[in-house]
Design a protein with these regions (language model features):
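N-terminal non-catalytic structural scaffold regions of very large proteins
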Residues: 1-109, 118-119, 124-132, 141, ...
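Extracellular/lumenal glycan-associated surfaces
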Residues: 114
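RNA substrate-recognition surfaces in RNA-acting enzymes
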Residues: 135
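Conserved structured catalytic cores and adjacent interaction surfaces
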Residues: 138
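A glycine- and charged-residue-rich anion-binding loop/surface
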Residues: 154
């Protein structure tokens, strides 16, 4: 972070990192300067790590993602590792859209919607589309809920064998 600190003026550094702690707090997942890793799709509540690119964008990964920075991985060229943490109110509610890529099969939509229903959350809309190579895309719009409730739903969906990718889309 020493190199990065030299690149940013002192007042901006204090505002971004809160002094000498060097932790970037993420308050908005839809901030255009923040991009979520396309490999692991972290959401608030996940343990995360991050990189700052030379263009000042911050890329966030699960802390256990193969592309995250840890003592075993070398830092990729053009990336500066930075400590990151979620700073999103646990009381903030918002509508969420889940985009789930699955291996297609019987009963998959039922299993996914059951997890959402069991969390006490209402599904507003859902769309499915069959893709090539036995894959399907499922898009589910759910009612306004807090990030912790959303995180619990995603944590129950991630381990399902047929789920290949889950991400949260920005709702309109």
């Amino acid at each position: 972070s020493g190199r990065l600190k030299g690149m940013i003026n002192h007042q901006l550094w204090e505002k971004l990192f809160g002094g000498e702690k060097n932790i970037f707090l993420i308050e908005d997942v839809h901030n255009p300067l923040i991009r979520m890793g396309n490999c692991c799709f972290p959401i608030p509540g996940d343990k995360i790590s991050g990189f700052i690119f030379e263009d000042k964008e911050i890329e966030i990964h699960h802390s256990n993602c193969k592309n995250s920075f840890n003592k075993k991985n070398k830092v990729p060229v053009g990336k500066i590792p930075v400590e990151v943490a979620w700073s999103i109110s646990e009381k903030l509610t918002q509508q969420h859209i889940l985009h789930i890529q699955v291996i297609d099969g019987a009963g998959i939509l039922y299993q996914i919607t059951k997890i959402i229903k069991d969390a006490g959350v209402t599904i507003i809309n859902s769309e499915t589309a069959a893709k090539q190579n036995n894959y399907a895309d499922i898009r589910i719009e759910i009612e306004s809920i807090t990030w912790p409730v959303f995180h619990k739903i995603v944590e129950k969906l991630r381990p399902l064998k047929f789920v290949k990718k889950i991400q949260e889309e920005a709702s309109a």
